[in-house]
Amino acid sequence: MSKYVDLTGKPFHFIGIGGIGMSALAYILAKRKLPTYGSDIKSSHITRRLEAIGAHIFWHQEAKNLELFQQTTEEQNLFLSNNSSLNLSQFTPCISLGEVTTKKHNVKLENHKGISQLPQVVCSTAINTTNSEYKAAVELGCPIFHRSDLLAALIQDYQSIAVAGTHGKTTTSSLIGFMLLEAGLDPTIVIGGEVDAWGGNARLGRSPYLVAEADESDGSLVKLSAHIGVVTNIELDHPDHYDSLDQVVEIFQVFKENCQNLVGCIDCSTVREKLQPTISYSINFESDAHYKVDCVHYQSNVTLARVWEKGQILGQLKLRLLGKHNLSNALAAVAVGRLLGLEFSTITSAIALFEGAHRRFEYRGECNGIVFVDDYAHHPSEINATLAAANLQKNQELSPKPHISTKKLTLKTQNNSLKIERVVAIFQPHRYSRTQAFISEFAQSFNDADMVIVTNIYSAGESSEGQINSQQVAEAISRYHRQVYYRSSLDSVSKFLYQVLKPGDLAIFLSAGNLNQIIPELMARYQQPHYQVKSCEIA
């Protein structure tokens, strides 16, 4: 793949533009008025957001999408008139003769058929070499980039903060981005989750600052060179790419060398021993970290702590996010903010307002005394941390507003007073390779749940042949848990939950796949006037 990304005006074409990582990059390019094209197989709120700012999307992945870029303007118009999936009123051919104006440059394009007319093709690890568009890009001689190449190029344009780590990247990067936004620094933000404060997974600012989520899943983390790097933790994950923790550590060590400053959580022994960050943080007051906390109070609706900086008390920290892991994420934001010269009061004011990213302990609603929460946890450590946070809700009066992530302070419960008595975990394992590699750890990750329902593995493109299955996962969990149930399909999960959930339950959906799709339908059933708690034979 090519390494040099031209950000001066040449068109970009994203294969799989609707993905969470790809769409964030496409959004930044489109907002910078660079010609932005892409393909995907279905429309979503993410792709509609891109189209609204001028991105042009093909709803199929075919070689002819790229052939468009070698045609004359007249040929393009004919092609587009026969392609009803594109909005012709928005479409301006990117290879017409003349000048393409961008924010910083005026670039003169040569005659059609010239190599300068070919788009720069961006793909992710999910796109393989058999993809018809990818093959067409190779045959046409298009510059082809991994999405990490494009992110690396963007990072070089800014005073950048790149947040890496096995867990907590999205929350930490979005929290840092929100902090800079509240501080009036108008950052550019590129993350792997959606945040209401900027209406999606990316925003284009006007300042020199960029906050990016840095993904280690495929080894491409080594391409990123940030002014400030953050590492939240390091564990073995993505067994489809890594065979050992040592391989993961090597990637993070290269990342450290590429960053001018490294902020790291030394509660993780691997970060402490293998990376030795220049600026450290810890939620253990006995540690020798530069930033640490004491007087910690984990409550059902808030976390409180006193923050220390290099042996001196900074002051009180209050955050709406629950659990030890989120206190650690907030402390990372404190360390970054102080490194940037922000006043502690500015930092804490922002953290106190932050409501979290979507699908990170996201409150989806309450019906008939049942609270519904959506969470992205799909690794044993993430499940442990998330269920521990869920347990903080038990036996607490949630009145009048349950305090659970996004929109939590604007959604009132239907009941004047609601007490959580039971945590029900609904788990959709993600990838056969991960499930097989960590089956022993998954088996012991649900101790903080009162009931566990397991459904079929979300393959994420992996073959199921000869692989572990979810019934085996349920059996493994049942060795450590008394109430574990297996339901094969999402429909059967929904029907089962309708039978067993009751007032006082917190139903938490744990999935990086599509499990959360059943939440709206399930809530709608509970809102029907004839709803009553049913009993059934549980097996």
Curated annotation (Swiss-Prot):
Signal peptide: none annotated. Keywords: ATP-binding, Cell cycle, Cell division, Cell shape, Cell wall biogenesis/degradation, Cytoplasm, Ligase, Nucleotide-binding, Peptidoglycan synthesis. Its EC number is 6.3.2.8. Coiled coil: none annotated. One of its GO terms (molecular function) is UDP-N-acetylmuramate-L-alanine ligase activity. It catalyses: UDP-N-acetyl-alpha-D-muramate + L-alanine + ATP = UDP-N-acetyl-alpha-D-muramoyl-L-alanine + ADP + phosphate + H(+). It is found in: Cytoplasm. InterPro entries: Mur-like_cat_sf, Mur_ligase_C, Mur_ligase_C_dom_sf, Mur_ligase_cen, Mur_ligase_N, MurCDEF_pg_biosynth, UDP-N-AcMur_Ala_ligase_MurC. It is an enzyme of class 6 (ligase). ATP binds at G165, T166, H167, G168, K169, T170, T171. Its main location: cytoplasm. Pathway: Cell wall biogenesis; peptidoglycan biosynthesis. GO terms for cellular component: cytoplasm. One of its GO terms (biological process) is cell wall organization. Pfam families: Mur_ligase, Mur_ligase_C, Mur_ligase_M. Belongs to the MurCDEF family. Cell wall formation. HAMAP family: MurC (MF_00046). This is UDP-N-acetylmuramate--L-alanine ligase. It comes from Trichodesmium erythraeum (strain IMS101).
